[in-house]
Amino acid sequence: MKNAFKDALKVGRPQIGLWLGLANSYSAELLAGSGFDWLLIDGEHAPNNVQTVLTQLQAIAPYPSQPVVRPSWNDPVQIKQLLDVGAQTLLIPMVQNADEARNAVAATRYPPAGIRGVGSALARASRWNRIPDYLHQANDAMCVLVQIETREAMSNLASILDVDGIDGVFIGPADLSADMGFAGNPQHPEVQAAIENAIVQIRAAGKAPGILMANEALAKRYLELGALFVAVGVDTTLLARGAEALAARFGAEKKLSGASGVY
C-alpha cells in the first residue's frame, strides 16, 4: 500500500491543493484533472457525509491528484467510516492540545497501535479484503494532519508536534484570526506573524506545515517559509467569482464580491 501524498511530504516536496466544497463527485472529477497535487474534501463546512465523500473518492481515484478528507470533528466513529470508504489522509479540525492529537492518531490505527475498528470485509479501503495483508499494512499508509486554529492550540504547538504519528500541522487562518479578535481579516499583521512563526516551528520539528490561502502573494510567502501543503483556492469561490465576472462583462449589474478572507 502507498500514500503518495504522505510520501511527498516526507521528502519535503511542496504540494499545491484546492478545497472542494461543492460536495459533488462530478465537479470533483473535473477538478481532479486540473493539475493540483491534492484536493480537500470538506466534511466540516461543506454538506458532505460518508456517502458523498465515497463518491468523490471514487471520482478522484483515476487521477494523479491525491484526496485529503476533513471530517466534521475529531470523532473516532466518523474517522473509522471515512477510512473504511478509502480515505488515507485526514485533516482533523480544531485540535487544541497533544491529547487530542494523540486521539486523532489512535483513531486511524488498528489495535494494538490504536482503536480503529476492524471491518475490512465491508471496506472499500481493503478492496473488500482483496488487498493481501491489509490489516497489517494500513497503519503505515495513514497520514494524519491536525489543524491548529486558536491561540490555545498555538500555545500547545510544541507538545502537539511531539506526538508520534502526526505527519503535518495545518494552520486554520479563518478561525485563528477570529480567535485572535480579527474575524474576517487573516491578513492582519498579528495573525500573519503567528502564522509565519508556526510554519517555521512546524518545519523545524520535522513535520509538514500546511495552510489554505487564496491570496496568491501570501500563499507563495508561506511556501518560501517552508509550508509543504498549501491550498490556494476553493471550488465554490472559483465558480462564483468566475460566473460573476463573466456576467459583468456582458453588462450584468450584480456587484462583484469584495470579500478578502481566506477563501
From Swiss-Prot:
<dbReference type="InterPro" id="IPR012689">
    <property type="entry name" value="HpaI"/>
</dbReference>
<dbReference type="GO" id="GO:0046872">
    <property type="term" value="F:metal ion binding"/>
</dbReference>
<dbReference type="InterPro" id="IPR023701">
    <property type="entry name" value="HKHD_aldolase_ent"/>
</dbReference>
<dbReference type="GO" id="GO:1901023">
    <property type="term" value="P:4-hydroxyphenylacetate catabolic process"/>
</dbReference>
<comment type="similarity">
    <text>Belongs to the HpcH/HpaI aldolase family.</text>
</comment>
<comment type="pathway">
    <text>Aromatic compound metabolism; 4-hydroxyphenylacetate degradation; pyruvate and succinate semialdehyde from 4-hydroxyphenylacetate: step 7/7.</text>
</comment>
<dbReference type="InterPro" id="IPR050251">
    <property type="entry name" value="HpcH-HpaI_aldolase"/>
</dbReference>
<feature type="site" description="Increases basicity of active site His">
    <location>
        <position position="84"/>
    </location>
</feature>
<feature type="binding site">
    <location>
        <position position="147"/>
    </location>
    <ligand>
        <name>substrate</name>
    </ligand>
</feature>
<protein>
    <recommendedName>
        <fullName>4-hydroxy-2-oxo-heptane-1,7-dioate aldolase</fullName>
        <ecNumber>4.1.2.52</ecNumber>
    </recommendedName>
</protein>
<keyword id="KW-0058">Aromatic hydrocarbons catabolism</keyword>
<feature type="binding site">
    <location>
        <position position="175"/>
    </location>
    <ligand>
        <name>substrate</name>
    </ligand>
</feature>
<dbReference type="GO" id="GO:0043863">
    <property type="term" value="F:4-hydroxy-2-ketopimelate aldolase activity"/>
</dbReference>
<comment type="subunit">
    <text>Homohexamer; trimer of dimers.</text>
</comment>
<dbReference type="GO" id="GO:0010124">
    <property type="term" value="P:phenylacetate catabolic process"/>
</dbReference>
<keyword id="KW-0456">Lyase</keyword>
<comment type="function">
    <text>Catalyzes the reversible retro-aldol cleavage of 4-hydroxy-2-ketoheptane-1,7-dioate (HKHD) to pyruvate and succinic semialdehyde.</text>
</comment>
<dbReference type="Pfam" id="PF03328">
    <property type="entry name" value="HpcH_HpaI"/>
</dbReference>
<keyword id="KW-0479">Metal-binding</keyword>
<feature type="active site" description="Proton acceptor">
    <location>
        <position position="45"/>
    </location>
</feature>
<feature type="binding site">
    <location>
        <position position="174"/>
    </location>
    <ligand>
        <name>substrate</name>
    </ligand>
</feature>
<feature type="binding site">
    <location>
        <position position="175"/>
    </location>
    <ligand>
        <name>a divalent metal cation</name>
    </ligand>
</feature>
<dbReference type="InterPro" id="IPR005000">
    <property type="entry name" value="Aldolase/citrate-lyase_domain"/>
</dbReference>
<dbReference type="GO" id="GO:0005737">
    <property type="term" value="C:cytoplasm"/>
</dbReference>
<dbReference type="InterPro" id="IPR040442">
    <property type="entry name" value="Pyrv_kinase-like_dom_sf"/>
</dbReference>
<feature type="site" description="Transition state stabilizer">
    <location>
        <position position="70"/>
    </location>
</feature>
<dbReference type="InterPro" id="IPR015813">
    <property type="entry name" value="Pyrv/PenolPyrv_kinase-like_dom"/>
</dbReference>
<feature type="binding site">
    <location>
        <position position="149"/>
    </location>
    <ligand>
        <name>a divalent metal cation</name>
    </ligand>
</feature>
